[in-house]
């Protein structure tokens, strides 16, 4: 079987089974069903206002339902479980059945519809819509719609948060269709929002600001500490450079003095031919032969 036909077949089986349960369990307050296919078989959960009537005396009714489902719909090892609906006013199928029953008993359709809507909204529903169609008054068919609260009509939220129910009321003039749509109190609407109060905003805003302030102070302290360390290192480097420069200058002066002394000693010990010597203010000078000027003996002679 193709995938498309498989989906169509599954939908047909579920719709037919829902109609069968609604007909067989009308007195028990039938409120819908779920089908879950597992490796152990097919699990069918039936929701009802009176689950005891679904089970029956010694399980007689539920065994009969299981045999009929297996015979009519050819399911794999069907197992039926009955669950009680705690709040029938929030179950769309139950309210549709009640509305149809009220109309069949002779209630005016508008009164029955408003009473049903009032019960649904008093139970805490976010929205409710009731549509009654058929020969309401007169010989022509028409549609009567009643809406209260918030209702979605299209899109994915319709499948997620809107509960649908449908039932028929048989009158002398014809059949009336009763459709009920309910949005439960715990449903999350797609356009819902909530304003935060001042305390929540204060807690959300103050904490990051305080953290930023403390972080900023810590950063400033770290920067100042790094600056002080850098200044101290620079001062140590400058002092070391000055000390090295002074040491180099002293070494140069000592070397120059030693060279001068060595030159003087050399000059005193070596005397050239035709050279004249004299002492002026403690400085020895000499004059070479053939020259008319005197100069210190420690001066280097330029070779000619």
Curated annotation (Swiss-Prot):
<dbReference type="GO" id="GO:0022627">
    <property type="term" value="C:cytosolic small ribosomal subunit"/>
</dbReference>
<dbReference type="InterPro" id="IPR009019">
    <property type="entry name" value="KH_sf_prok-type"/>
</dbReference>
<dbReference type="InterPro" id="IPR036419">
    <property type="entry name" value="Ribosomal_S3_C_sf"/>
</dbReference>
<comment type="similarity">
    <text>Belongs to the universal ribosomal protein uS3 family.</text>
</comment>
<dbReference type="GO" id="GO:0006412">
    <property type="term" value="P:translation"/>
</dbReference>
<feature type="domain" description="KH type-2">
    <location>
        <begin position="17"/>
        <end position="86"/>
    </location>
</feature>
<protein>
    <recommendedName>
        <fullName>Small ribosomal subunit protein uS3</fullName>
    </recommendedName>
</protein>
<dbReference type="InterPro" id="IPR027488">
    <property type="entry name" value="Ribosomal_uS3_arc"/>
</dbReference>
<dbReference type="InterPro" id="IPR005703">
    <property type="entry name" value="Ribosomal_uS3_euk/arc"/>
</dbReference>
<keyword id="KW-0699">rRNA-binding</keyword>
<keyword id="KW-0694">RNA-binding</keyword>
<dbReference type="InterPro" id="IPR001351">
    <property type="entry name" value="Ribosomal_uS3_C"/>
</dbReference>
<comment type="function">
    <text>Binds the lower part of the 30S subunit head.</text>
</comment>
<dbReference type="InterPro" id="IPR015946">
    <property type="entry name" value="KH_dom-like_a/b"/>
</dbReference>
<comment type="subunit">
    <text>Part of the 30S ribosomal subunit.</text>
</comment>
<dbReference type="InterPro" id="IPR004044">
    <property type="entry name" value="KH_dom_type_2"/>
</dbReference>
<dbReference type="Pfam" id="PF07650">
    <property type="entry name" value="KH_2"/>
</dbReference>
<keyword id="KW-0689">Ribosomal protein</keyword>
<dbReference type="GO" id="GO:0003735">
    <property type="term" value="F:structural constituent of ribosome"/>
</dbReference>
<keyword id="KW-0687">Ribonucleoprotein</keyword>
<dbReference type="Pfam" id="PF00189">
    <property type="entry name" value="Ribosomal_S3_C"/>
</dbReference>
<dbReference type="InterPro" id="IPR004087">
    <property type="entry name" value="KH_dom"/>
</dbReference>
<dbReference type="GO" id="GO:0019843">
    <property type="term" value="F:rRNA binding"/>
</dbReference>
């Amino acid at each position: 079987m193709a995938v498309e036909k498989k989906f169509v077949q599954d939908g047909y089986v579920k719709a037919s089974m829902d109609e069968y349960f609604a007909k067989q369990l009308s007195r028990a307050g039938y409120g819908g069903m779920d089908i879950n296919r597992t490796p152990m078989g097919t699990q069918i959960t039936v929701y009802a206002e009176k689950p005891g009537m679904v089970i029956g005396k010694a399980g007689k009714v539920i065994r009969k339902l299981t045999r009929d489902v297996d015979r009519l719909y050819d399911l794999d090892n069907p197992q039926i479980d009955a669950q009680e609906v705690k709040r029938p006013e929030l179950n769309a199928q139950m309210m549709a059945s009640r509305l149809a029953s009220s109309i069949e008993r002779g209630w005016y359709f508008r009164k029955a519809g408003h009473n049903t809507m009032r019960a649904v909204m008093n139970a805490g529903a976010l929205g409710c819509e009731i549509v009654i169609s058929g020969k309401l008054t007169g010989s022509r068919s028409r549609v009567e719609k009643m809406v209260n609260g918030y209702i979605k009509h299209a899109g994915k939220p319709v499948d997620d948060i809107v509960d649908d129910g449908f039932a028929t009321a048989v009158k002398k003039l014809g059949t009336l269709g009763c459709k009920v749509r309910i949005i439960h109190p715990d449903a999350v609407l797609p356009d819902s929002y909530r304003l935060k109060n001042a305390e929540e905003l204060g807690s959300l805003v103050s904490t990051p600001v305080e953290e930023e302030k403390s972080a900023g102070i810590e950063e400033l302290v770290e920067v100042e500490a790094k600056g002080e360390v850098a200044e101290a290192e620079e001062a140590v480097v400058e002092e070391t450079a000055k000390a090295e420069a002074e040491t180099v200058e002293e070494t140069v002066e000592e070397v120059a003095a030693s060279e001068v002394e060595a030159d003087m000693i050399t000059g005193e010990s070596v005397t050239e031919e035709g050279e004249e010597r004299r002492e002026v203010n403690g400085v020895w000078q000499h004059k070479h032969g053939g020259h008319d000027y005197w100069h210190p003996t420690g001066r280097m002679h330029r070779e000619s």
